[in-house]
């Protein structure tokens, strides 16, 4: 499969990390503990990469960042839904690695080491203010949106670092977050979470 910038994907995303609420990394401040351990998940509700349909597939990215996110190199592992066929797997890898341009090309500039790209059984659920992800044998993450005035979502807009730069980010709290792979092991709860819809496209 050749690299193309003729693509667009839409869906929902969420993440959790070890930072206190709200994670200061999105404001280009240092992580709460000096390092950030984050797992980010996306569910593609509709998508197409140069003719390859991507509807209904999940993707996740685990990252270890030993300092301010824009000042140090990230160590990352990418997970692609095992239901993806060969063409879909290649398309999603090109998109989320930044090779196909768009938002992830900018994110890729911060990556210093890719420790793995693999397919895995993934279960992503979005219901109301709750989000959950299971990567079989590797990770489990569950967050719940926090209530603002009159129960409305608490949101962050126009933050300089964002997984989805053109959508308000809903602030959430983790109920559970475990990850174990590539020599990294995290077991957290009661920490930061974010979620929002997303639309990404090539240049």
Each language-model region and where it sits:
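N-terminal ordered "arm"
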Residues: 2-49
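Short linear motifs at secondary-structure transitions and domain/linker junctions
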Residues: 13-20, 35-36, 50-56, 108-111, ...
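Residues in flexible loops and secondary-structure boundaries
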Residues: 17, 22-27, 33, 50-52, ...
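Short amphipathic beta-strand and strand-loop transition segments with alternating hydrophobic
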Residues: 25, 61-66, 120-124
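Aromatic- and glycine-enriched beta-alpha-beta binding-site module
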Residues: 34-104
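Charged linear interaction tracts used for macromolecular binding and regulation
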Residues: 74, 78-157, 162
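Extended, charged low-complexity segments
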Residues: 148-203
């Amino acid at each position: 499969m050749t690299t193309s910038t003729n693509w667009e994907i839409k869906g929902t995303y969420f993440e959790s990390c070890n930072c206190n609420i709200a994670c200061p990394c999105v404001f280009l401040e240092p992580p709460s503990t000096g390092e950030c351990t984050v797992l980010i998940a996306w569910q593609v509700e509709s998508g197409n990469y140069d003719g390859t349909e991507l509807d209904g597939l999940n993707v996740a990215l685990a990252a270890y960042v030993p300092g301010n996110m824009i000042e140090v190199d990230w160590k990352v592992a990418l997970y692609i839904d095992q239901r993806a066929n060969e063409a879909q797997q290649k398309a999603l890898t090109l998109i989320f690695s930044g090779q196909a341009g768009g938002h992830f090309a900018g994110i890729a500039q911060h990556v210093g080491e890719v420790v793995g790209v693999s397919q895995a059984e993934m279960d992503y659920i979005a219901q109301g203010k709750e989000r959950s992800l299971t990567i079989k044998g590797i990770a489990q993450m569950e967050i719940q949106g926090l209530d603002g005035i009159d129960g409305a979502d608490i949101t962050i807009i126009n933050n300089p670092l964002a997984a989805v730069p053109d959508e308000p980010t809903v602030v959430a709290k983790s109920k559970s977050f475990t990850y174990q792979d590539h020599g990294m092991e995290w077991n957290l709860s009661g920490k930061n979470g974010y979620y929002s819809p997303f639309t990404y496209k090539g240049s």
